């Protein structure tokens, strides 16, 4: 067997050739960090000097984290998932990706978490693309004024606090005053637009549930499905059981999904239910990250938290497709205190607010809109002409009615004009009541408010106002073309007004039984009048409140 010989020159030449051909640029640099502490959904990581703000990091067990605090020696990371498997000393790797969420039409009718992962058990979602959660809002030159109506189907709102497409309208009130009900009714009211198939009319809806009970979210989903509204709605759910980081991110995830449609020239309605819980989650995260607290222990940038979110709602210019995203943020108050820190912040950011008063709600005035301090700063220009015509003095009439009502509590007798004001005001308040999940088409609202403001309901007992309205609208629907004309033209022409006058006079004759002395109540039974002998000096006294 030949002896193996090694020549030193051959070895030297081979090493020189390898060294000459080596290119450092082909070497991959891998940064590895290590967990120093992990608890309460927050981890602190050493290393990773090149990490970006809002970059996704991957822990050893596959859990993702979001880089937040970029300090000199360590990084504060929000853990996006279960943190029980993350321990001190474990490796952390960069992904090189900014936090983003998948988007597209396939999300309609689905329930997803703040990372865009479906949680409704209906399988995977084939996304069209992804969109970063933190995006710059449209600039001034990329917007145009709000000029298209966003009908809620609620008489009290569409008449006095109108909302336009691209507007941000705050819904604020104590717990259990009907805030979510208004938002859900607004979604249900878009059904006719969706069924039309016209992209310019259709509104895609996003319901972002932040810190709600899982049973409440399931109830909202079931309501939308039962009423045929789930097919054009996406639900982004971060229930109360989710970590604070998920609740903080949920509104941005919903906004990113909506922006994809907005920049495609489509119309979007997004509801944040509610931003109070998002602010509390952000406060918890910030305190755990050891950021300095400010007023009410909120961090100093809590205003920016909401402003950068709500500024994404806009009506885009024609050059960008004229799409829109309308925002309905919800804020929960404590004891009707709208002057608290978070409520005043969001009021100053939005284009108006709908204040729901718990006293009105408990008095069965639902929706419990307090017309006195509710306002829409830009929606009036988007109101349809017929509604603007009939509701012009409605807000003033109700304000005068409330003043007169307070005065009448202490006055022994009133003049005829004051009594007339109280009579009409009480009927207008009754007319603005509306059952839940029954939004009205705008033409029905116009007819109802026209009848109330022009005195055609003054003779109708207050307890029969809603029955009169319901039966009169049914009469118009079957016997005339008035509602069809209003829906097509959105104008209250003189000929339409004359036809309405004739119809309501004829209907009142039948409603009151051609002037017979019938009792008009909740039931439909008829009773004979009692003789004076049977009613000997009987008096009915109406107690004053």
Curated annotation (Swiss-Prot):
Its EC number is 7.1.2.2. F-type ATPases have 2 components, CF(1) - the catalytic core - and CF(0) - the membrane proton channel. CF(1) has five subunits: alpha(3), beta(3), gamma(1), delta(1), epsilon(1). CF(0) has three main subunits: a(1), b(2) and c(9-12). The alpha and beta chains form an alternating ring which encloses part of the gamma chain. CF(1) is attached to CF(0) by a central stalk formed by the gamma and epsilon chains, while a peripheral stalk is formed by the delta and b chains. Produces ATP from ADP in the presence of a proton gradient across the membrane. The alpha chain is a regulatory subunit. Keywords: ATP synthesis, ATP-binding, Cell membrane, CF(1), Hydrogen ion transport, Ion transport, Membrane, Nucleotide-binding, Translocase, Transport. Gene3D superfamilies: 2.40.30.20, ATP synthase alpha/beta chain, C-terminal domain, P-loop containing nucleotide triphosphate hydrolases. The keyword Acetylation does not apply. One of its GO terms (molecular function) is proton-transporting ATP synthase activity, rotational mechanism. GO terms for cellular component: plasma membrane; proton-transporting ATP synthase complex. It is a peripheral membrane protein. It is an enzyme of class 7 (translocase). SUPFAM superfamilies: C-terminal domain of alpha and beta subunits of F1 ATP synthase, N-terminal domain of alpha and beta subunits of F1 ATP synthase, P-loop containing nucleoside triphosphate hydrolases. The record marks 374 as: Required for activity. Pfam families: ATP-synt_ab, ATP-synt_ab_C, ATP-synt_ab_N. It comes from Renibacterium salmoninarum (strain ATCC 33209 / DSM 20767 / JCM 11484 / NBRC 15589 / NCIMB 2235). ATP binds at residues 173-180. This is ATP synthase subunit alpha. It is found in: Cell membrane. It comes from the Bacteria.
């Amino acid at each position: 067997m030949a002896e193996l010989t090694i020549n030193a020159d051959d070895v030297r030449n081979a090493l020189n050739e390898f060294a000459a051909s080596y290119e450092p640029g082909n070497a991959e640099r891998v940064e590895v960090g290590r967990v120093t502490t992990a608890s309460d959904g927050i981890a602190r990581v050493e290393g990773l000097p090149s990490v970006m703000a809002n970059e996704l990091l991957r822990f050893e067990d596959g859990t993702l984290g979001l880089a937040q605090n970029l300090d000199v020696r360590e990084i504060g990371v929000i853990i996006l998932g279960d943190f029980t498997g993350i321990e001190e000393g474990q490796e952390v790797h960069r992904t090189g990706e900014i936090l983003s969420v998948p988007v597209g039409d396939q999300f309609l009718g689905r329930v997803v978490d703040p990372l865009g992962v479906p949680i409704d058990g209906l399988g995977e979602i084939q996304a069209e693309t992804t969109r970063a959660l933190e995006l710059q809002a449209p600039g001034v030159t990329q917007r145009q004024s709000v000029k298209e109506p966003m009908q809620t189907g609620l008489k009290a709102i569409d008449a006095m606090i109108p909302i336009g497409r691209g507007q941000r309208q705050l819904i604020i009130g104590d717990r259990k005053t009907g805030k979510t009900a208004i938002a859900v009714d607004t979604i249900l009211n878009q059904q006719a637009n969706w069924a039309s198939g016209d992209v310019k009319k259709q509104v895609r809806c996003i319901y972002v549930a932040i810190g709600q009970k899982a049973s409440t979210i399931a109830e909202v989903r079931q309501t939308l499905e039962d009423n045929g509204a789930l097919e054009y709605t996406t639900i982004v759910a971060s229930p109360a059981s989710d970590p604070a980081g998920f609740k903080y991110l949920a509104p941005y995830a919903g906004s990113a999904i909506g922006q994809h449609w907005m920049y495609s020239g489509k119309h979007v309605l997004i509801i944040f239910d509610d931003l109070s819980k998002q602010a509390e989650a952000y406060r918890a995260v910030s305190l755990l990250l050891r950021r300095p607290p400010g007023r009410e222990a909120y961090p100093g940038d809590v205003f920016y938290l909401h402003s950068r979110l709500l500024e994404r709602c806009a009506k885009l210019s024609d050059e960008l497709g004229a799409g829109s995203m309308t925002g309905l943020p919800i804020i929960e108050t404590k004891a009707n205190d709208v002057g608290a820190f978070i409520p005043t912040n969001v009021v100053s950011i939005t284009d108006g607010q709908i204040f729901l008063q718990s006293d009105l709600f408990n008095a069965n005035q639902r929706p419990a809109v307090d017309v006195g301090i509710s306002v829409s700063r830009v929606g009036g220009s988007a109101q349809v002409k017929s509604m603007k015509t009939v509701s012009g003095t409605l807000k003033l009439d109700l304000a005068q009615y409330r003043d007169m009502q307070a005065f009448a509590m202490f006055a022994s007798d009133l003049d005829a004009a004051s009594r007339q004001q109280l009579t009409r005001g009480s009927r207008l308040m009754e007319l603005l009541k509306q059952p839940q999940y029954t939004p009205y088409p705008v033409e029905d609202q116009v007819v109802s408010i026209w009848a109330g403001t022009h005195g055609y309901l003054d003779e109708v007992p207050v307890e029969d106002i809603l029955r009169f309205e319901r039966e009169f609208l049914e009469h118009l629907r079957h016997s005339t073309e008035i509602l069809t004309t209003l829906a097509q033209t959105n104008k209250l022409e003189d000929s339409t007004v004359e036809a309405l006058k004739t119809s309501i006079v004829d209907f009142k004759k039948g409603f009151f039984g051609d002037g017979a002395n019938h009792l008009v109540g909740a039931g439909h039974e008829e009773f004979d009048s009692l003789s004076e002998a049977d009613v000997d000096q009987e008096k009915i006294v109406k107690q004053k409140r």
